[in-house]
């Protein structure tokens, strides 16, 4: 990668001064551009970290009606930033005329470019990328976010060659559902499910599953399964399943693709189902597959501090981004226990397993010994923390630290804890 311009030495010839963005980032070369935004390589002045900065022209987005897409992209990336295979958003800044999205740098470029260079990928390589894609999309679906534009150009690679899903500008968030279904045609035709193009109400997760089937075909074959300059003819092929598998694709991979490219979304193989197949599980790096979300939340990392949007909210730009960065009040209860910290820990572990959470224990030292049990399910992480103030006094805090837990599950958890409660403190519901 090209290095960014360095401050010039007094003895060196005069050069164009590096452009410093709002005193925080040194802008480098352009990485790409579109009709209303461009992306630059940049370096953090504070940390020296290389990042990508998407520079969005406010006037163009307002005139073209693209502001809802910008809002969705920011909100989706904010919600999903803890998954290792989803491109992270670090910070949002703004001036009177521009919005700056500071994002993780995917220095490996587009997966699409890799496929173009090689023609097709070995099945083991294609499977690894597909595993990471499925993991990222399942994570987003569990948080109610459907991507709706899954294609190789939106699948980036970091310097280690790991997949990073990007461009959530067409994503649908839970509040955009009507009767549980989406109703807007989005995406790129060759990768878009037939029910989306027909503008019927559709399940965003099932539509993403279709796109994943096309992606897997492209990785293994080097071409799309349905390709016709006449869109109507292409969709007739889709409904007839009119495509052919090359001889080098394994029987298991063919079966998965065939089931994911089912034109009927009701009978189409879901991402959850494909992740249970033996083909998918082969060579799966389990530790990598499940890492990141759980550990980061058990360690009580801030869920909002990486995004600063005060400027966005206060500017008279026509873009109303207020509310995107207001952290919702999390469920939390506190009580004095009638048992020891160790017993609280064991009880929390037992309850978590009973109620279907993934359980992780941890011990920390503060002023006294602190027992921490993390309970994870989908996008939601709950922490049970027991602090031994004295030998006889143990205070326990139960709180949702990431995602949201529905009222019935939260009530079940609190009810299960009742038999170790000596007294409840003032509650934060």
From Swiss-Prot:
Stored CDD domains: CIPK_C (cd12195)
PTM info: Autophosphorylated.
Active site: residue positions: 149
Parts forming coiled coils: none
Swiss-Prot/TrEMBL catalytic activity: L-seryl-[protein] + ATP = O-phospho-L-seryl-[protein] + ADP + H(+); L-threonyl-[protein] + ATP = O-phospho-L-threonyl-[protein] + ADP + H(+)
EC identifiers of the protein: 2.7.11.1
Cofactor: Mn(2+)
GO molecular function, a single term: protein serine/threonine kinase activity
Any Pfam family hit: NAF
SUPFAM superfamilies assigned: Protein kinase-like (PK-like) (SSF56112)
Induction statement: By sucrose, glucose and fructose. Repressed in roots by salt stress. Up-regulated by cold stress.
Annotated stretches, region: Activation loop: 167-195
Spans annotated as PPI: 330-363
Positions with a binding annotation for ATP: 31-39, 54
Modified sites of kind Phosphoserine: 171
Phosphothreonine: residues carrying this PTM: 184
Tissue: Strongly expressed in leaves, but barely expressed in roots, stems or flowers.
GO biological process, one term: response to cold
Record's function text: CIPK serine-threonine protein kinases interact with CBL proteins. Binding of a CBL protein to the regulatory NAF domain of CIPK protein lead to the activation of the kinase in a calcium-dependent manner. Phosphorylates the rice sucrose synthase (SuSy) in vitro in an allosteric manner. Involved in cold response.
Assembly and interaction partners: Interacts with CBL1, CBL2 and CBL3.
Domain notes: The activation loop within the kinase domain is the target of phosphorylation/activation by upstream protein kinases. The PPI motif mediates the interaction with the ABI (abscisic acid-insensitive) phosphatases.
Family: Belongs to the protein kinase superfamily. CAMK Ser/Thr protein kinase family. SNF1 subfamily.
The protein, known as: CBL-interacting serine/threonine-protein kinase 7
Species name: Arabidopsis thaliana (Mouse-ear cress)
Gene responsible for this protein: CIPK7
